[in-house]
């Protein structure tokens, strides 16, 4: 029986976060009324000329520097010729032979697949190129009985098309790459990453070949996948479709396909064109893009600390594990919040801060469906909660209660934790005499558990601790309760 190898390459369109379009001064705001953000250049009216947006170029340079690519000192804009109703010029301005970003790498972390018995692993994906181009408009098929409406607000919006080598071998690798790329462009501030609005979307080129064969199989391109789940589902379906087709004696044809998320299947859209079908040629209205070393150095000077470097720093500076550092640097906002908490709580509390961010904080964020930059608990407020755990004022259990109270009331005072502790009488009981009296009562009331413990049943000890904590409404110092119980039980 033939064993098949999957071959995947991704082309990702990241909408660059410029205020105006790539070749005109029209705004790029999402959600405006149709055709209210299109100027004569976007409409391709006679006599108008494109003017390149410097901000788009700088964002492309920033991306290239982040992935270790070569920034082309001289690159060319080309006309990609094809007809579509929402492309007024009859061509798209893109880059072909000489893109602005050449090469580069992105390292991905592929999660374990327990069902398949595959462990987690790291992989480096090589990039072919990243080039600047303009987006097309949008065809609107609803609300127009028997007709199609055209909205040109999106026409001319700057895109960075990022192309990988065909090096991914599973949907899991493709999704891991897409997530890493998404996190990077958002981290760099070059794209808002809003997949629902189409700011970040992927085209997947998928083929299969017998294991050991060097020649690639015939590929199908699945267009405009705007969620990581759709990307995974579309690739998995397409792989199954191609294998079944070949094993049944058929042939895979080179074509463009769309993914139907309701049916969870891909369907044919059109035959897939080759580059020569687009009749690329240099755009005579645009001069070659010349990028000097001084320009690159200016962009380099404004680069943020990159996730990989920050992850390593967190391990060395704060003593957190590599895994924890990876989670904490999954977004710039999360990393900034963590460092702000540690700055207030002290470096000695860095590990507990990391645990809280990955535990209670993340849980509450997921519950409310918000991101870390919208968290209602300030870094200073959380830091004080952690300090009160560290100095023995409250237990970890009470700390969770206080954190939830600050969150729910959206408190604005920095000392909210102390206010709530005093108002509700939540200070931890650490007085040895008071705790001994409570423990004596617990032992007297739970003679059976005492006998079971002395007979060697360790679970009975935990039950006694639970009773002591219950008697103090969770306010007893757990460590002291543990020590006093052991002492009294001999």
From Swiss-Prot:
According to its UniProt entry, the function of this protein is described as: Allows the formation of correctly charged Asn-tRNA(Asn) or Gln-tRNA(Gln) through the transamidation of misacylated Asp-tRNA(Asn) or Glu-tRNA(Gln) in organisms which lack either or both of asparaginyl-tRNA or glutaminyl-tRNA synthetases. The reaction takes place in the presence of glutamine and ATP through an activated phospho-Asp-tRNA(Asn) or phospho-Glu-tRNA(Gln).
State what protein this is by name.
Answer: Aspartyl/glutamyl-tRNA(Asn/Gln) amidotransferase subunit B
Fetch the Pfam families from UniProt: GatB_N (PF02934), GatB_Yqey (PF02637)
State the organism of origin.
Answer: Burkholderia ambifaria (strain MC40-6)
Q: What is the lineage of its organism?
A: Bacteria, Pseudomonadati, Pseudomonadota, Betaproteobacteria, Burkholderiales
What reactions does this protein catalyze?
A: L-glutamyl-tRNA(Gln) + L-glutamine + ATP + H2O = L-glutaminyl-tRNA(Gln) + L-glutamate + ADP + phosphate + H(+); L-aspartyl-tRNA(Asn) + L-glutamine + ATP + H2O = L-asparaginyl-tRNA(Asn) + L-glutamate + ADP + phosphate + 2 H(+)
Query: Any one Gene Ontology biological process term?
Result: translation
Superkingdom, natural source? Bacteria
Tell me one GO molecular function of this protein: glutaminyl-tRNA synthase (glutamine-hydrolyzing) activity
Query: What are the EC numbers?
Result: 6.3.5.-
